[in-house]
Amino acid sequence: MKIYLVGGAVRDALLGLPVKDRDWVVVGSTPQEMLDAGYQQVGRDFPVFLHPQTHEEYALARTERKSGSGYTGFTCYAAPDVTLEDDLKRRDLTINALAQDDNGEIIDPYNGLGDLQNRLLRHVSPAFGEDPLRVLRVARFAARYAHLCFRIADETLALMREMTHAGELEHLTPERVWKETENALTTRNPQVFFQVLRDCGALRVLFPEIDALFGVPAPARWHPEIDTGIHTLMTLSMAAMLSPQVDVRFATLCHDLGKGLTPPELWPRHHGHGPAGVKLVEQLCQRLRVPNEIRDLARLVAEFHDLIHTFPMLNPKTIVKLFDSIDAWRKPQRVEQLALTSEADVRGRTGFESADYPQGRWLREAWEVAQSVPTKAVVEAGFKGVEIREELTRRRIAAVAGWKEQRCPKPE
């Protein structure tokens, strides 16, 4: 029996990045031998075991053979005669097909070290094309390592295009697509994930609502980048700088979906695109089974981001109604989330990357004023039933009006 550290732990250590999880491959052993050594078996389809002390995963070396469609149609073979090189060959990218023995020596049968040095994401073998999930994984790796200047090898991108055009991505379940997307949204450069999907044709298949934005013009006065698809990715990039939250980043990604519905004869204007985009947000989220909390914020951002841009022109009643509409009294975090997504929208434009966004500050200040109006005082004043809500709203509007007179500049 020989045990090797494999995959991401080896890769990230070589890149000087923190190692979160460690996976191990066991060569020359059997399930019974592992059980006798105190390991606990957890894999049903192939033998994976948990170490009795560390609880890290130890998998018997195995090979895989395509036996069906999609990413689940594989038959695994695990036996003592499967070599380390056999096991590494089934992996997706050369930088993930690295192993380290107990002496610290790196085993690199597929030039993963060279590709690490050259910052290249390259597939190990043609078997890459048998698993459509790998298209999303490569896009996610490209986003994860974009700050290190990694790029996808030309031949790998070509294979990803072939897989997409062959309809392989249609076998992916919504849950897996969302899981990869969610993971990509946590990276430093999530916009790269969607750009890679567009480069290989997968964006049109998996995210048609986003793909439809490319080629749709916006007024050059407000959008020097002109193309709404480009603006969307720029906005997502800015959101990633402003917030680590997946729901903020996803909502930013979806904020302009309504522009994809504008008839070409009305271009480059997109009047009413915010509310129009709500149904597309719902459509996308229902298809991918996006969690409700993430979906709900995306709907609100699509509907209200343009309203927040015009904050100085809003009367106090409209401002309080906005807080009602986003359910801020029960979910106050939404005020900050809308401020961040709206700021990302404004700064996600060519030449506006460092622009100030006072509307965000005013939104936050108005919220602090409105929510500081005490409900208890209304009740103690003798109001009952529906009158409490009406009086509380009246007092909130009055408080916001007083603040706006002092703090928020009047529109010219």
Curated annotation (Swiss-Prot):
Essential cofactor(s): Mg(2+); Ni(2+)
Known partners and oligomeric status: Monomer. Can also form homodimers and oligomers.
EC assignment: 2.7.7.72, 3.1.3.-, 3.1.4.-
Gene3D superfamilies per UniProt: Beta Polymerase, domain 2 (3.30.460.10), cca-adding enzyme, domain 2 (1.10.3090.10)
Family, as annotated: Belongs to the tRNA nucleotidyltransferase/poly(A) polymerase family. Bacterial CCA-adding enzyme type 1 subfamily.
Stretches that traverse the bilayer: none
Gene from which this protein is expressed: cca
Residues reported in the UniProt entry to bind CTP: G8, R11, R91, R137, R140
SUPFAM superfamilies xrefs: Nucleotidyltransferase, Poly A polymerase C-terminal region-like
Annotated positions binding Mg(2+): D21, D23
Identification of the protein by name: Multifunctional CCA protein
Residues that bind ATP: G8, R11, R91, R137, R140
HD domain: residues covered: 228-329
Superkingdom, taxonomy of origin: Bacteria
Functional description taken from the UniProt entry: Catalyzes the addition and repair of the essential 3'-terminal CCA sequence in tRNAs without using a nucleic acid template. Adds these three nucleotides in the order of C, C, and A to the tRNA nucleotide-73, using CTP and ATP as substrates and producing inorganic pyrophosphate. tRNA 3'-terminal CCA addition is required both for tRNA processing and repair. Also involved in tRNA surveillance by mediating tandem CCA addition to generate a CCACCA at the 3' terminus of unstable tRNAs. While stable tRNAs receive only 3'-terminal CCA, unstable tRNAs are marked with CCACCA and rapidly degraded.
Miscellaneous section: A single active site specifically recognizes both ATP and CTP and is responsible for their addition.
GO term, biological process aspect, one: RNA repair
UniProt KW Protein transport keyword: no
